[in-house]
Design a protein with these regions (language model features):
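Eukaryotic beta-rich interaction modules
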Residues: 1, 198-200, 206-238, 294-307, ...
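Amphipathic, interaction-prone secondary-structure segments
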Residues: 1-8
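Aromatic/acidic cage segments in peptide-binding pockets
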Residues: 8-48, 268-274, 337-381, 793-799
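Glycine-centered motif in EGF-like
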Residues: 21-90
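Extended, well-ordered protein cores
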Residues: 140, 144-295, 302-305
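ATP-dependent carboxylate/phosphate-activation module, predominantly the ATP-grasp catalytic core
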Residues: 236, 242-292, 342-391, 395, ...
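Conserved metal-phosphate-binding beta-hairpin within the catalytic cores
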Residues: 316-341
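Intrinsic-disorder-linked linear interaction elements in eukaryotic regulatory proteins
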Residues: 341-384, 389, 396-800
């Protein structure tokens, strides 16, 4: 038995025994029997190297282990920090085709290695961990990398715990804190994570649309938290937040603010309003702290009035709440209104009697919480600056030309006008120097464009009514201009990009990403589809992609309603029914006939026919996206493209189907036989009698199927999450600088910056992460453009 000590120089065998502790090196304790060779043998810088010397059996076992690991897939042995959400493909292998997996005995021990045996079994204080990491020093690059890595790891672990808790809430495995209240108002607490459902249980959003507005607000709150995390203002804190969509319900998970559950005589909300504007706080310290936030988000200081008519100045919306926790930190909560209203859409589509609604068959939009995206505000602000600079340059050129003409005229008439006093055309300063007249002087360039997040809200309307103002303020006008810019410039420009294939999204996710990058909300999908001609062959495919995105989102909302009206154990049958009614009508015209007796007892399922589903989809698309689907859209657009739509719907809902060939028409027996033989890996080779019997049984089973998707094909429901992820700002800056250098032709500098960004991403996020994969892909393209195809293939392999 050897006893090993770890020191700054490495590891060495000490002189301890089973009954006596002696940290002295074993080679020195032997005295005269020791030699330089023994000293080298009993110590090493690496623990692995020392163990290999001491135990030949360990050395052989380690060599065998490394040999076995070299034969595995890279993703099975690569270390990873963690990710916000595990990859959940929409098609997975069933139990009969599942690939054997090796159990990693080291993974359950990781928490003990990080936290110790005692802390691993205790409740984690998620909020204190997050705020402590945020307060870590970041004065140099190494400190920033360590801080970013710890933040990413915390967010990943918090998201993992929040997903497990949210699934327990939906499955009814967690008791609520207020069991006597209605189900929509239930709150939950487990492992120091607070859970609530995405309903308007407290009637906060009654005037904005009720549950529909509350559902939107939860997602916008994540966007607001993400904005503040990117700004990373010292002294301003946010909560860890995750929104989880699972089995038709939305659950919000948040870390707990210190002291939030304690009753205090004085209110903790010191900034903003907690009672819909009855009282509005404006703490001076909070106001100063929010000044850099307002500057970064282009918010101006604006006035709001409470119910008593008292006027206060705020930077953020009154719905954003500033709170001082018992730990002395300042927190911002309810960040769903961190951008202004889309006032043009609100006035034209969200109010009955408006011309845009009255002149069409479209219903009134289902909620009034229609906000602009932060990307659009940035684009509009930059566009406004560009226009102002151009106008200033034109005016400056005109002034210069005018002064030159005036100077020439003065030169010609210098003799005759020499006796005249120049006081009429020039002023003299204190030093006696002549300068142009104040009437002709062009002022220095100044630009100011601020938005009010409370523009066109009831609180601002109350203030205007008090002061008797009828016209819009400058900040209100800026909000209206941004809304018009979205409708009249951004949306048509994006439609032209799609029509000309300047932007070529290949999936619904890529389309959504492209729209969000341009600041376009999903409610404008219908407007984009209307701008794309349906009779042009080259545009037909991209228009179908836009329409399928609307259809899949409409089906998601329909399924959400069905799940809430159906027992949990019938969700698989309910989903299979919807999928068959949507993409399986060419094989079975009445899928509801094949429901189980228990499912037929649910009225919503028994009455669901393909025609009824198509009408409901058309109604949802018209309501949510302001687009009128053709009455025969299933026959004209879905037929022949069922697999594409099936994939989009499954990804939107969060479901995993069995990996097999789905026949949307009744297949022939020969086709089924060939597919099964090919899937089993036999090809044209000889099969045994047992194998032939198995193939025949499988063929008969497929031929007897009446539906495209059976309820047994629904293997799993996965949780879809929205996480307020923290990105590494320095790594992102290096990445963008590298891309810009490559576009400018500076290949060497660009490649160096990209490799530096790649190293930072690997240190922060690990190898197995989407951000790291993005860097690998861009570096691969840079090498490919330079003709270095082997390096390009190597980096692209790592990206994939």
């Amino acid at each position: 038995t050897y006893h090993i000590t770890a020191s700054r120089d490495g590891f060495y065998v000490n002189s301890s025994s089973l009954v006596r502790f002696s940290p002295e090196p074993y080679s020195e304790a032997r005295g005269g029997q020791s030699s330089a060779r023994d000293a080298e043998f009993y110590q090493a810088h690496s623990l692995i190297a020392l163990l290999r010397r001491l135990s030949p059996r360990f050395a052989r076992g380690l060599d065998d282990l490394q040999k076995e690991m070299s034969q595995r897939e890279a993703v099975e042995v690569l270390p990873f920090v963690s990710a916000e959400q595990a990859a959940s493909p929409w098609l997975v292998r069933g139990n009969e085709n599942r690939v054997p997996q090796t159990y990693d005995v080291g993974q359950p021990q990781e928490i003990y290695l990080r936290l110790g045996a005692q802390a691993a079994d205790s409740l984690r204080d998620w909020n204190e961990e997050l705020q402590s990491i945020r307060e870590m020093p970041r004065s140099n690059l190494s400190e920033r990398v360590v801080r970013d890595r710890q933040l990413h790891k915390w967010y990943s672990e918090f998201a993992e715990a929040a997903i497990q808790g949210a699934m327990a809430v939906v499955d009814g495995e967690m008791p609520p804190l207020n069991p006597t209240d209605p189900d929509e108002q239930h709150m939950y607490l487990r492992d120091n994570i607070f859970y609530s459902k995405g309903f308007d249980g407290r009637e906060t959003f009654t005037e904005l649309g009720g549950d529909a507005a509350a559902h939107v607000a939860t997602g916008k709150d994540i966007t607001g938290v993400r904005l503040l995390n990117q700004l990373d203002i010292d002294g301003l804190h946010t909560l860890g937040s995750v929104v989880v969509d699972y089995r038709g319900l939305r659950v919000v998970a948040q870390s707990v603010v210190p002291g939030i559950f304690r009753r205090q005589e004085t209110t903790q909300i010191v900034y903003g309003s907690v009672d819909s504007g009855v009282t509005v706080g404006a703490d001076e310290d909070f106001h100063k702290l929010l000044e850099p936030v307002a500057k970064a988000l282009h918010f101006g200081e604006h006035a709001v009035a409470d119910e008593a008519g008292n006027e206060v100045k705020l930077y953020t919306s009154a719905d954003v709440k500033g709170l001082t926790g018992t730990d002395g930190r300042k927190y911002l909560l309810d960040l769903f209104r961190m951008t202004p209203m889309d006032i043009e859409f609100l006035e034209s589509q969200c109010t009955e009697g408006q011309d845009a609604v009255a002149d069409s068959a479209l219903p009134v939009y289902h909620h009034r919480l229609v906000l602009l995206r932060p990307e659009l505000l940035d684009i509009f602000w930059e566009n406004s600056v560009r226009k102002a600079v151009q106008e200033y340059a034109v005016e400056k050129a005109k002034r210069s030309q005018k002064e030159e003409s005036k100077a020439e005229g003065q030169t010609e008439g210098e003799g005759s006008d020499a006796a005249k006093q120049p006081a009429e055309t020039a002023d003299k300063d204190k030093d006696g120097e002549t300068k142009p007249s104040s009437d002709d002087a062009l002022p220095e360039f100044e630009f100011s464009l601020d938005f009010s997040p409370d523009a066109f809200t009831p609180l601002q309307a109350r203030l205007k009514a008090k002061e008797g103002e009828g016209s819009e303020s400058a900040m209100d006008a800026a909000v209206r201009s941004a809304s018009r810019f979205l409708r009249d410039v951004s949306v048509p420009a994006f439609a032209r990009e799609l029509a000309s294939y300047t932007t070529s999204p290949l999936s619904g996710d890529a389309l959504v990403t492209a729209m969000h990058q341009r600041g376009i909300n999903m409610r404008y999908l219908g407007a984009i589809a209307n701008l794309l001609p349906s009779d042009v062959e080259i545009v037909r495919n991209v228009r179908r992609l836009v329409v399928f995105e609307m259809v899949s989102r409409a089906v998601k909302h329909i399924v959400r309603g069905l799940f809430q009206a159906t027992p949990a154990h019938l969700h698989s049958e309910a989903l299979a029914l919807v999928l068959n009614a949507l993409v399986g009508t060419r094989r079975c015209a009445s899928p509801a006939e094949h429901l189980s007796a228990e499912a037929k007892a649910v009225p919503q399922l028994a009455a669901l026919t393909p025609e009824l589903l198509a009408d409901e989809v058309r109604a949802q698309v018209a309501l949510r996206f302001r687009f009128e689907l053709a009455a025969d859209f299933v026959e004209s657009m879905v037929a022949g493209n069922e697999r594409i739509l099936l994939r989009e719907v499954c990804q939107k809902i969060g479901v995993q189907l069995a990996l097999r060939q789905y026949h949307f028409e009744q297949p022939t027996e020969s086709d089924v036989y060939s597919e099964i033989v090919s899937s089993m890996g036999f090809g044209s080779g000889k099969m045994t009698k047992t194998t032939k019997r198995q193939v025949r049984e499988r063929v008969d089973e497929v031929m007897q199927q009446k539906l495209v998707v059976e309820s047994d094909d629904v293997l799993n429901f996965v949780a879809l999450t929205k996480v307020s992820t923290h990105n590494s700002s320095f790594a992102d800056e290096a990445f963008e600088a590298g891309r810009m250098s490559l576009e400018q032709g500076q290949r060497q500098m660009g490649l160096e910056l990209l490799l530096e960004s790649l190293a930072l991403h690997e240190q922060t996020f690990g190898f197995l992460h989407a951000e790291s994969a993005r860097c690998y892909a861009v570096v691969s393209l840079a090498h490919y453009d330079a003709g270095e195809h082997e390096l390009a293939a190597d980096f692209m392999t790592k990206a994939v």
